[in-house]
Amino acid sequence: MAIVGIGTDIVEIARISEQRERLGDRLARRVLTEPELATYMQSKQPERFLAKRFAAKEAAAKALGTGIGRGVSFQHIHIDNDANGAPQVRFTDGALARLEQLAGKHGFISIADEKHYAVATVVLES
């Protein structure tokens, strides 16, 4: 097994809060898949949830070497948690096609947040 991609992103949570105040849930609907959106809507801290998912998806897109665009959208990257609460990343559509081009088999993700920031790192392996 070899590393075929790595990406990191950091998001200022206040920026997400400002976007949410101005645009309501438009950003969330653009970034989150349906299951993620359902979790977001029930979250006690929706801005923090969205900031972490945004950072995670940007990190995943960077690991793919495309960023968001060039055939990869936010909707092609799904972040959820396993039974122990650890985050996991799954790829579909254009993101999955790009992962396969890289001969990637699996993505590992770490997400963290503190008062002002959310950060995520994704490592792709063959």
Curated annotation (Swiss-Prot):
Function: Transfers the 4'-phosphopantetheine moiety from coenzyme A to a Ser of acyl-carrier-protein.
Gene of this entry: acpS
Cofactors required: Mg(2+)
Top-rank taxon: Bacteria
Protein name: Holo-[acyl-carrier-protein] synthase
A GO BP entry: fatty acid biosynthetic process
Organism (species): Shewanella frigidimarina (strain NCIMB 400)
Membership in a protein family: Belongs to the P-Pant transferase superfamily. AcpS family.
Keywords attached to this entry: Cytoplasm, Fatty acid biosynthesis, Fatty acid metabolism, Lipid biosynthesis, Lipid metabolism, Magnesium, Metal-binding, Transferase
SUPFAM superfamilies referenced in this protein's UniProt entry, alphabetically: 4'-phosphopantetheinyl transferase
HAMAP family the record matches: AcpS
Database matches in InterPro entries: 4-PPantetheinyl_Trfase_dom, 4-PPantetheinyl_Trfase_dom_sf, ACPS, Ppantetheine-prot_Trfase_dom
Catalytic activity reported: apo-[ACP] + CoA = holo-[ACP] + adenosine 3',5'-bisphosphate + H(+)
Residues reported in the UniProt entry to bind Mg(2+): 9, 58
MF-aspect GO terms: holo-[acyl-carrier-protein] synthase activity; magnesium ion binding
EC number(s) given by UniProt: 2.7.8.7
GO cellular component, one term: cytoplasm
Keyword Transferase annotated: yes
Enzyme class label: transferase
Signal sequence extent: none
A Pfam family recorded for this sequence: ACPS
Subcellular location: Cytoplasm
